[in-house]
Swiss-Prot record:
Organism, scientific name: Francisella philomiragia subsp. philomiragia (strain ATCC 25017 / CCUG 19701 / FSC 153 / O#319-036)
Active site: 114 (proton donor)
Residues reported to bind a divalent metal cation: 104, 114, 153, 183
Record family assignment: Belongs to the aerobic coproporphyrinogen-III oxidase family.
Cytoplasm as UniProt keyword: yes
The encoding gene: hemF
Any one biological process term the GO annotation gives: protoporphyrinogen IX biosynthetic process
Name the record gives this protein: Oxygen-dependent coproporphyrinogen-III oxidase
Amino acid sequence: MQEKITQFENFLAQLQQKITSTLEQSETSSAKFISDKWQKPDTPEQKLKGYGNSMIIEGGEIFEKGVVAFSRVHGDALPPSATAKRQELAGKSFIATGVSLVIHPRNPFVPTSHANFRIFVAGADTDNPIWWFGGGFDLTPYYPFEEDAIHWHQTAKNICDKHDASYYPSFKKLCDEYFYLKHRDECRGVGGLFFDDLNDKSFDECFKFVTDCANSYLDAYIPIVEKRKNIEYSQKHKDFQLYRRGRYVEFNLVFDRGTIFGLQSGGRTESILSSMPPMATWKYNWQPEPGSEEEKVYEYIKPRDWIK
């Protein structure tokens, strides 16, 4: 099992470099991703041990802020957030390795994107380790274009159908349900794919699906960035983007399992919270004008079948 984990870790390290270098090609300023490598000390009092590399871009003309973070961590006991649905794993040692990314564009007509690909192994030091993959990608537009959402979902469906025709409808539904702000009665965006506890096939089959899915993220996102990044926008557009980013912050701090897992397990706070947008605003009881561009997004972020 250790060899398989290392194989996935090596893939993730290469994925991180591929994504950051490709995003830099879309960036029109001199802004680049900077690398912040870190390591948790292997001491008895340290709950979470391991290492990682957080790659951050800030202040770009296209990407106002973005993070592509790799980590491999292990601990003596899974935190509550990881065993909420698997009580039998409570107290087991674990290894977790993954890449998580969030890209916050400057232009309000370019959507924010998020992706995550990871593996958990509980009891890796035992004769019967329990493994599962998780991940997916989702899109959060501020001024939505239907063709962008269709392209995003078609890319997701194409990669799923290569492996299992049941994956896309299942993982799309899970994505709509997961990225939902209960207190707002709103979805975070137009969805995409979300899967957790993926071990329904052999390890090698699941490995291949997750790596194919990870490699398709750029195919889904970059064409949208290139199509929208030069659209002119006003301060009104920017203000609405900042207001909607507030929803992103609310979701990450209240509902996101990865954020909660990282904080509960003693993870590296700077890396965990690096996905936050550089700026966001909240307005008391604000409502969009009827028939406005801003009102349109509230119809787009409702679950729907994007592929006819």
